[in-house]
């Protein structure tokens, strides 16, 4: 295997060097002068060289989970689909967060000195949406695009630039993600739109979403929270990572049932961040919200953290949230990707599970959580608040967007089951209180 060396930039600054040796093993070392945000919480700033087992999970987290998608990209560039360094050499100019990878001769491009936007018509966007529905491998990216998105769902990224949608060429940062839902689940993109809007209405920070139609193709359009427009009108990147990356776990193990991260793993990671109180509170709200609406895909890759210098970090807004209760087959055996206090059955999250979530039977963890403001009383109050508010807020969202195609059908199949789930949570807590 060919040796390879890629410059690694974070927020446009050279942060270090990613290397691959002749055996295919990768490593990363920070530049001696770099003082910015760490590449990952698993790789704090240091003069050491981080080895293959630490670096590899982070790199794979930047790539699509789907092996078919990775194979399609690999075939385009004639590299191996299981070689993240080789893939990022070609599509690493616009990754999740603020990290960029490039060869030394691409540094000008990576720093934005060689970039451009290509405007798209509604018809062209409709064609891209239709293509990922028919065969998501075909439209992972267009020619001359250099972005990469993690995850398993068909999607593509564009930029809103000068009042129009554009493809990004060179290192131009994308600003929005387009997806038309998980194949096989009716109105799934609309489902996600409603669940995201509901979460925001109950007070949980979420990525901005809109539901748009391009000719006859509907899409959920998600504004990237890891992008911001500065005072000069330029788009800046914010560095972030998901919790598989933050815990050094490969995306293939993102589900707890597959040996992936647990709520306790995330709690323990957040305790060591600043401000840990706010991060733990928000994570609890997000976890309980996913549980109460029966979201089956709220695994560790669907929680992320925005990184600052040192241990400064802020839990990222919610994203990729949709209820499984809208679908009869999932209602019958609904399971959560990440349990609450060891309980992953939707509708069974009762007082015992909530108490176990507060410490998981570990006195040291329980004390740390309580000291951080995450008391058992707070956990019960959070679940009850959500159980009261979610049915009201979800119905308000559905009514506000009643004219969207498919909304009446979604109301019929989702609102009732979600309300029932909320009522069961309240009943279990009330029964415990006597």
Q: For the regions a protein language model found, what residue spans apply to each?
A:
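Anionic ligand-binding catalytic core segments
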Residues: 1-300, 304-434
